[in-house]
From Swiss-Prot:
Subunit structure of this chain's protein: Monomer; does not require oligomerization for channel activity. May form oligomers in the membrane. Interacts with SLC26A3, SLC26A6 and NHERF1. Interacts with SHANK2. Interacts with MYO6. Interacts (via C-terminus) with GOPC (via PDZ domain); this promotes CFTR internalization and thereby decreases channel activity. Interacts with SLC4A7 through NHERF1. Found in a complex with MYO5B and RAB11A. Interacts with ANO1. Interacts with SLC26A8. Interacts with AHCYL1; the interaction increases CFTR activity. Interacts with CSE1L.
GO BP annotations, alphabetical order: bicarbonate transport; cellular response to cAMP; cellular response to forskolin; chloride transmembrane transport; intracellular pH elevation; membrane hyperpolarization; multicellular organismal-level water homeostasis; response to endoplasmic reticulum stress
Region (Disordered R region): 654-832
Recorded GO MF terms: ABC-type transporter activity; ATP binding; ATP hydrolysis activity; bicarbonate transmembrane transporter activity; chloride channel activity; chloride channel inhibitor activity; chloride transmembrane transporter activity; intracellularly ATP-gated chloride channel activity
CC per GO annotation: apical plasma membrane; chloride channel complex; cytosol; early endosome; early endosome membrane; endoplasmic reticulum membrane; membrane; nucleus
Record motif PDZ-binding, residues: 1480-1482
Pfam families: ABC_membrane, ABC_tran, CFTR_R
Broad class of where this protein is predominantly found: membrane
Residue spans crossing the bilayer: 78-98, 123-146, 196-216, 223-243, 299-319, 340-358, 860-880, 920-940, 992-1012, 1015-1035, 1097-1117, 1132-1152
UniProt-recorded name of the protein: Cystic fibrosis transmembrane conductance regulator
Domain ABC transporter: 423-646, 1212-1445
Lipid-acceptor residues (S-palmitoyl cysteine): 524, 1397
Positions of glycan attachment: 895, 901
């Protein structure tokens, strides 16, 4: 990064933001890179800010029993906050003085007041100076407040992250990842965005007192009629806001539900295509979308009328304020114009600024209280260790994960108590759990000496992982003692990879030792894998190691644990994803040799590992079932195999034990996995599903969170808005809502109508887009816009013209913003934070995108034409009013008046043009109703356009080839369906209407001005050109800076979630300070982009303001110098001048809004234009004859046309099969050829990453394939792709359970009856499981079916294959992490239901070999062997070495029938002698 010019900038450069010119110039000429961003000053660095706030917070904790976070913030930021507030107040006060000067200028042209004509020029100079002063005061004040809000957010970000790394595991049980993300994004945005609004809570009352005093001087008591109307209006809009909140709550559940299904579809797109579920998923999502859009339209209409009511009120405020005075005393034109100006300012203060300020304080204090509660939660307590201790000793250890856990099931028991069990079971699945805490470990005692290997075994839920957590200090013992040195290294069961290089993941901040590093790489079998990467061990891995296979991730995690020099190594099932050969080699070379001198605790279920262990600990239901050597085990515990291998079914566990198992499972999800649990105390723990899911989901237990499948227990009837669970005293929606929903300040930066930097103010509001949850405040004010993400949110500075609200040109319709649905979708709910959504689209939206958007709906063009016609009618009405004005004025001059003798107070007199004004307003308002309703068809049609684009994009994604998904990131795809569709639904319709209307207003005003003073028109032309040039100049840079900021925002949340996933590993390695440093670097990188964007935006807004001031000076003096007698004309000229330029400023800002939002349309079009999967017809080699089918049609094979007859046998022939993940990529399979007979079972063998799963995907045509494949004589080129895939039954490695009922998960197309479903469920062992849930087949599974075990999920996949009636079954490592009971069920079903089917199995378990007749050995992307298992083992191959002697005996039981033959075979299979232990031990 470059040094910032701000460091050397002088006062004027800082005042006018001129120091940003270099980056603006560079961004205009070329594409900006991260290296072009300026370094941040020390005052903005995360280290500096967090240190100051942390010091004050520690001081607060030490000094008081009830510490207050707001006191710590006050000591850090108070005086700067006050200073900027005073400057802001002075800028706002100038608005009250402007109407006085305007009134004096108008009065000076009264024929009866020629004395003041000589000072008109000085009054004009004063009016212009007021605009200059306000510009110089407001822009620095607003920038300073947002800068300070950014600093507060940074400091709190750091404080929360540091606290997260210290939280105890018990607290983490109760906090989901979604809650932490929401705490950082939604809540902390309030500081970034709302700080400038906070001062209006005291500025507005002072302003109202001042304005009412001035109005009293003009109108006496009648002025309070206008104020009363404004108060009523504010209450009415608050009521409309409540209506919008109701629609929002109802809509939130549908949006959430749609995004959950969409996210699951994207994450499991390979399974969706393998099952041929594209149509089912499309229908499911479109049904949810239809319901969502009905509520979207209702919400848009209410927002539209809410904003229209605000503008409509302009006439009535003035009318009610003037009418009583006019009826009693009569009124002169000067007072009317002055009153109009005062009322505009007063209306803005009462109905906009004050409610927003109160709402901001309410939200900000609520956020501070949430953060304060979080910072006071229980911390992880480091155990006291004795560094001289060499042994590991545990004495009578008993521990609980959560002593109050049983309360969770109270309501489940109540809800299920009235359900009768037909099979006589003693209760439902959840009603069997104990209501008391169950210890996860009970009376555990053992001692391990230095250098010994302890193997820990046990069935599922026995407490194995909890034992390691106890040793690490993550689980506090309630009884007993633990002794060890404290120098621990840890390898978790679920591999954790941090973003960084392979070397960084292994070294993990420890000092680099070349010899040790190479030894570990070799022992963990990583040499060959690393050599295949172009950058070797400097290859950068994404979050979670997404580019690696499961086995590679597992080996890197193991290497990290071993590289650290520790006294005790804790290895939690490190071999789960490894093939037989690799597991054997790593266990021997790494665990037994390299670490021979170290104390090791290994969790395993392999008999070979137990035999080589020095000590064995078998846990059963949390208790010690056996402790000792293997030689003692068989004698003392003959039934050890059932306890070890888990043959005691989960369903047969005691109620207490099942409670403990589920506790541990959920806890593990919340810390190490992608999912998280939110346990809330007491009354929050309900098993009723939220009403948003509708009647068909009424039996569900859990509420789905959004994009990354978080889950939480939800309160009955409370919609999930953030996708996280809040406490009862912290509702998801505000209980106070003074501001209409669409205008609440939760995610606003000062909007265009809030901080009035422009000469005129008309309320307008833009809310944060759905996916702008990161620290992305947006400034737009004065005529400013603060934008967030791709959705620009306006600071809402509307013109504050004097006559603008009464004059036809100022009567704008709803400028209401799209509501902030970040709470609803929580997308950016969480996926965006994992993925850099780098765009390859131009910095400015192309004209082709606009044209395509307009023409995608046939009615849109006609609606736009209709709006134009209405505009022309209004302009005509305005010209008629001007004609009347000129006519009456002329008559006044020639005939004089005798109004003083008239008996009616409201007539045209020599001092009054009230009647003229009345006619003018009346004619203009003739078209008011038409003006209000003219926007509704446009908004309605644009929402319909959004519906069409969503449908087209969903279809394109479902039909896209897998090669597309191999190049796109899931988070980027999900962003299109969440963030961009939300923009199309909420922000874009009203923003486009704003832009169209504002442009028409400017054009109409110019026409009227030209009719009065052509000189002003000539002055307007260069200003319009300057505006357009400034916009083009700024837009090129601002869009690039926003993109860089968006990319810099991603690593912040990625780092947080990554840290949470690997929290146990971080603590075990003591790497918290290292990760805090990385987090601060991510914060600083984002701050650099965001601060520069704020500064350049302020540069643009100030230049726009200065251009306006120059224009207004010109208009003022042209009006004063060229106008004779007649105050009406000069009044109209000045008010129209302010109105034209403020509206033009607004239009320029609105055009930037539209350009930003249309980038979402560009991205959607990019997805719509994705290539689709080829139908792969047989291309005719000759020209088609008359009766032949068109070349575009698929000519189906005659065998396939016979229903249910193909495939009949399951014979497969593969010839020269080559597969690639992407077009032009390297071949991952080369020239594969083999054949499989009908009903034959074939096993796939090969090292991890050799291509076994790839081959199965190639069978389904999920890759780019070349070559020939036939099933029962039918080539895959001769039939539709969907029909080809339906020939296969699939049990994928990644289990796919989408949010829906059991019935939908088994049969999404609804083809089978309940009888058939129950029959298949019984056949695969699922019937007893499904019957335990309320609703049975109609029970709704959410969050990937997390309430089911992994084995149960596999059985659902197996049931799908049975229902598919497929003749060929593909199984991709179905036994990975399965308990033996489920595995035995799968084996049984394969023997029975698929007895006559062809089965292709990729498996690591030796037992699976017994079921296969032949094996396909894949090595280096090619088929190395295709033989029977007997031949593979007889040969001197690697697989012979991997299979133990006892397993080889299992493979050939018939060879043991006679002693002679057996001895001969045993001699042939003689074990190799073990190599000597190398001197490379750690």
């Amino acid at each position: 990064m470059q040094r910032s010019p701000l460091e050397k900038a002088n006062f004027l450069s800082k005042l006018f933001f001129s120091w940003t010119r270099p980056i603006l110039r560079k961004g205009f000429r070329q594409r900006l890179e991260l290296s072009d961003i300026y370094q941040i000053p020390l005052s903005n660095s995360a280290d500096y800010l967090s240190e100051n706030l942390e010091r004050e917070w520690d001081r607060e904790l030490a000094s008081k029993k009830k510490p207050k976070l707001i006191n710590a913030l006050r000591r850090c930021f108070f005086w700067r906050f006050v200073f900027h507030g005073i400057i802001l107040y002075l800028g706002e006060v100038t608005k009250a003085v402007q109407p006085l000067l305007l009134g004096r200028i108008i009065a000076s042209y009264d024929p009866d007041n020629k004395v003041e004509r000589s000072i008109a020029i000085y009054l004009g100079i004063g009016l212009c100076l007021l605009f200059i002063v306000r510009t110089l005061l407001l822009h620095p004040a607003i920038f300073g407040l947002h800068h300070m809000g950014m600093q507060m957010r940074i400091a709190l970000f750091s404080l929360i992250y540091k606290k997260t790394l210290k939280l105890s595991s018990r607290v983490l049980d109760k906090i989901s990842t979604g809650q932490l993300i929401s705490l950082l994004s939604n809540n902390l945005n309030k500081f970034d965005e709302g700080l400038a609004l906070a001062h209006f809570v005291w500025i507005v009352p002072l302003q109202v007192v001042l304005l009412m005093g001035l109005l009293w001087d003009l109108l006496q008591a009648s002025a309070f009629c206008g104020l009363a109307f404004l108060i009523v209006l504010a209450l009415f809009q608050a009521w409309l806001g409540q209506m919008m909140m109701k629609y929002r709550e109802r809509r939130a559940g549908k949006i959430n539900e749609r995004l959950v299904i969409t996210s699951e579809m994207i994450d499991n797109i390979q399974s969706v295509k393998a099952y041929c579920w594209e149509e089912a998923m499309e229908k499911m999502i479109e049904n949810l979308r239809e319901t969502e859009l009905k509520l979207t339209r209702k919400t848009a209409y209410v927002r539209y009328f809410n904003s229209s009511a605000f503008f409509f009120s302009g006439f009535f405020v003035v009318f009610l304020a003037v009418l009583p005075y006019a009826l009693i005393k009569g009124i002169i034109l000067r007072k009317i114009f002055t009153t109009i100006s005062f009322c505009i300012v007063l209306r803005m203060a009462v109905t906009r600024q004050f409610p927003w300020a109160v709402q901001t304080w309410y939200d900000s204090l609520g956020a501070i209280n949430k953060i304060q509660d979080f910072l006071q939660k229980e911390e992880y307590k480091t155990l006291e260790y004795n560094l001289t201790t060499t042994d590991v000793v545990m004495e009578n250890i008993t521990a609980f994960w959560d002593e109050g856990f049983g309360e969770l099931f109270v309501k489940a028991k109540q809800n299920n108590s009235d359900v009768k069990m037909s099979n006589g079971d003693n209760g439902l699945f959840f009603s069997n759990f104990s209501l008391l805490g169950t210890p996860v470990l009970k009376n555990i005692s053992f001692k391990i000496e230095k250098g010994q290997l302890l193997a820990v075994a046990g069935s599922t839920g026995a407490g194995k992982t909890s034992l390691l957590m106890m040793i690490m200090g993550e689980l506090e013992p309630s009884e007993g003692k633990i002794k060890h040195s404290g120098r621990i290294s840890f390898c978790s069961q679920f591999s954790w990879i941090m973003p960084g290089t392979i070397k960084e993941n292994i070294i993990f901040g420890v000092s680099y030792d070349e010899y040790r590093y190479r030894s570990v790489i070799k022992a963990c079998q990583l040499e060959e894998d690393i050599s295949k990467f172009a950058e070797k061990d400097n290859t950068v891995l994404g979050e979670g190691g997404i580019t690696l296979s499961g086995g590679q991730r597992a080996r890197i995690s193991l290497a990290r644990a071993i590289y650290k020099d520790a006294d005790l190594y804790l290895l939690d099932s490190p071999f789960g994803y490894l093939d037989v050969l690799t597991e054997k080699e790593i266990f021997e070379s790494c665990v037994c040799k390299l670490m021979a001198n170290k104390t090791r605790i290994l969790i395993t279920s392999k008999m070979e590992h137990l035999k080589k262990a020095d000590k064995i600990l078998i846990l059963h239901e949390g208790s010690c079932y056996f402790y000792g050597a293997f030689s003692e085990l068989q004698n003392l515990r003959p039934d050890f195999s059932s306890k070890l291998m888990g043959y005691d079914s989960f369903d047969q566990f005691s109620a207490e034990r099942r409670s403990s198992i589920l506790t541990e499972t959920l806890r593990r999800f919340s810390i190490e996995g992608d999912t998280a649990v939110s346990w809330n105390e007491g009354k929050k723990q309900s098993f009723k599903q939220t009403g948003d899911f509708g009647e068909r989901r009424k039996n569900s237990i859990l509420n789905p969170l959004n994009s990354i499948r978080k889950f939480s227990v939800v309160q009955k009837g409370q919609p999930q808005m953030n996708g996280i669970e809040e406490n009862d005293d912290e509702p998801l929606e505000r209980r106070l809502s003074l501001v209409p929903d669409s205008e609440q300040g939760e995610a606003i930066l000062p909007r265009s109508n809030i901080i009035n930097t422009g000469p005129t103010f008309q309320g307008r509001n833009r809310r944060q887009s759905v996916l702008n949850l990161m620290t992305r405040p947006s400034i737009s004010q004065g005529q400013n816009m603060f934008k967030t993400g791709n959705a620009a949110r306006k600071m809402s500075m509307a013109p504050q013209s004097k006559l603008s609200e009464i004059d036809i040109y100022s009567r704008r319709l709803s400028q209401d913003s799209g509501m902030d649905i970040s709470d609803e979708i929580n997308e950016e709910d969480l996926k965006e934070w994992f993925f850099d959504d780098v765009e390859n689209i131009p910095a400015v939206t192309t004209w082709n995108t606009y044209l395509r958007y307009i023409t995608i709906h046939k009615n849109l063009v006609f609606v736009l034409i209709w709006c134009l016609v209405i505009f022309l009618v209004e302009v005509a009405a305005s010209l008629v009013g001007l004609w009347l004005l000129e006519d009456i004025s002329f008559k006044d001059k020639t005939n004089g008046t005798n109004g003083a003798n008239n008996t009616f107070p409201v007539i045209i007199t020599d001092t009054s043009k009230y009647y003229l004004f009345y006619i003018y307003v009346g004619i203009a308002d003739t078209f008011f109703a038409l003006g209000i309703f003219r926007g509704l068809p446009l908004v309605h049609t644009l929402i319909s356009v959004s519906k069409i684009l969503h449908h087209k994009m969903l279809y394109s994604v479902l039909k896209a080839p897998m090669s597309t998904f191999n190049t796109l990131k899931p988070g980027g795809i999900l962003n299109r369906f969440s963030k961009d569709i939300a923009i199309l639904d909420d922000l874009l319709p009203l923003t486009i209407f704003d832009f169209i209307q504002l442009i028409l207003i400017v054009v109409g005003a110019l026409i009227v001005v030209s009719a009065i003073r052509p000189y002003i028109f000539l002055a307007t032309v260069p200003v319009i050109i300057a505006f357009i040039m400034l916009r083009a100049y700024f837009l090129q840079t601002s869009q690039q800076l926003k993109q860089l900021e968006s990319e810099a925002r991603t690593p912040i949340f990625t780092h947080l979630v990554t840290s949470l996933k690997g929290l146990w590993t971080l603590r075990a390695f003591g790497r918290q300070p290292y990760f805090e440093t990385l987090f601060h670097k991510a914060l600083n990188l984002h701050t650099a982009s965001w601060f520069l964007y704020l500064s350049t935006l302020r540069w643009f807004q100030m230049r726009i303001e200065l251009v306006f001031v120059i224009f207004f000076i010109a208009v003022t003096f042209i009006s004063i110098l060229t106008t004779g007698d007649g105050e009406g004309r000069v009044g109209i000229l000045l008010t129209l001048a302010m109105n034209i330029m403020s509206t033009l400023q607004w239009a320029v800002n609105s055009s930037i809004d539209v350009d930003s939002l249309m980038r979402s349309v560009s991205r959607v079009f990019k997805f719509i234009d994705m290539p689709t999967e080829e139908p792969l017809p047989a291309k005719p080699t000759k020209s088609l004859k008359k009766n032949q089918l068109s070349q575009v049609l698929i000519i189906e094979n005659e065998h396939v046309n016979k229903e249910n007859n193909w495939p009949s046998g399951g014979q497969m022939i593969v010839k020269d099969l080559t597969a690639k993940y992407t077009d032009g990529g390297n071949a991952v399979l080369e020239n594969i050829s083999f054949s499989i007979s009908p009903g034959q079972r074939v096993g796939l063998l090969g090292r991890t990453g050799s291509g076994k799963s790839t081959l199965l995907a190639a069978f389904l045509r999920l890759l780019n394939t070349e070559g020939e494949m036939q099933i029962d004589g039918v080539s895959w080129d001769s039939i539709p792709l969907q029909k080809w895939r339906k020939a296969f039954g699939v049990i994928p490695q990644k289990v796919f359970i989408f949010s829906g009922t059991f019935r939908k998960n088994l049969d999404p197309y609804g083809q089978w009856s309940d009888h058939e479903l129950w029959k298949v469920a019984d056949e695969v062992g699922l019937k007893s499981v499904i019957e335990q849930f309320p609703g049975k087949l109609d029970f709704v599974l959410v969050d990937g079916g997390y309430v089911l075990s992994h084995g149960h999920k596999q059985l659902i996949c197996l049931a799908r294959s049975v229902l598919s009636k497929a003749k060929i079954l593909l199984l991709d490592e179905p036994s990975a992490h399965l308990d033996p009971i489920t595995y035995q069920i799968i084996r049984r079903v394969l023997k029975n239901a698929f007895a006559n089917c062809t089965v292709i199995l990729s498996e690591h378990r030796i037992e699976a070999m017994l079921e296969c007749q032949r094996f396909l050995v894949i090595e280096d992307n090619k088929v190395r062997q295709y033989e029977s298992i007997q031949k593979l083992v007889n040969e001197k191959s690697l697989y012979r070495q991997a299979i133990s002697h006892s397993d080889r005996m299992k493979l050939f039981p018939h060879r043991n029938s006679s002693r002679h033959k057996s001895l001969a075979k045993i001699t042939a299979l003689k074990e190799e002698t073990e190599e000597e232990v190398q001197e490379t031990r750690l």
